[in-house]
């Protein structure tokens, strides 16, 4: 958002001879809230272009809403869910960024190169992590890797004890696709429980929150 505001400011608020006004709205990563925010921007504020959202589930919801507003151009923000553009696409919803599966290319081979022949998945239960896990497994399983267990956890989870208790002894590593505070909470609880499995991280796992985490488990990601 700050980048867009800076770009408009540097051009004196005018692009191609047109005065540009930026109107902001928040969604808190909830698809219903995102659609309500989009509805206000489009139907009340009369925006010509809507850019956003960030989260995968939000992106799918906004894509579906865009079909009811053909006069408005929708540009995907950071939402990396494949279904925003690959499933029932909308003619006025455009993606210029990569999606979750693409960001995981190469991680499956890296896991096999490290000798991780069996990997458990721990990921948040919504669209973007689904894409991340799919991207990892497509390559990893093709190379002979096995995923004996996938644990899908709620976004914003606080207690990972039941997931930690289910980690099989015979897996070589964990694929962790948790973002921000969720990742830090899991790493803290796993380390406190004596967990010692090496970890692979999704693109949302290595955020600044996780990089600032001081525990030993961070260093194994």
Show the residue positions of the predicted features.
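Beta-alpha junction/loop-to-helix N-cap segments that form part of ligand/metal-binding clefts
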Residues: 10-84, 96, 154-158
């Amino acid at each position: 958002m700050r980048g867009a505001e800076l770009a408009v400011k540097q051009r004196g608020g005018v692009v191609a001879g047109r005065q540009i006004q930026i109107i902001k709205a928040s969604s808190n990563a909830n698809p219903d809230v995102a659609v309500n925010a989009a509805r206000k921007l489009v139907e009340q504020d009369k925006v010509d272009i809507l850019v956003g959202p960030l989260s995968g589930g939000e992106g799918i919801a906004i894509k579906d809403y865009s079909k009811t507003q053909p006069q408005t151009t929708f540009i995907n923000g950071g939402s990396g869910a494949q279904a925003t553009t690959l499933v029932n696409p909308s003619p006025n919803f455009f993606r210029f960024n990569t999606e979750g599966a693409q960001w995981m290319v190469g991680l499956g081979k890296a896991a096999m190169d490290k000798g991780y022949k069996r990997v458990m998945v721990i990921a948040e239960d919504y669209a973007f992590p689904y894409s991340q896990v799919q991207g990892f497994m497509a390559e990893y399983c093709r190379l002979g890797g096995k995923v004996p267990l996938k644990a899908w956890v709620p976004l914003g989870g606080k207690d990972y004890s039941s997931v930690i208790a289910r980690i099989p002894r015979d897996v070589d590593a964990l694929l962790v696709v948790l973002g921000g505070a969720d990742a830090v909470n899991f790493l803290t609880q796993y380390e406190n429980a004596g967990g010692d499995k090496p970890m692979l991280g999704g693109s949302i796992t290595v955020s600044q929150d996780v990089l600032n985490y001081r525990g030993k488990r961070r260093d194994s990601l």
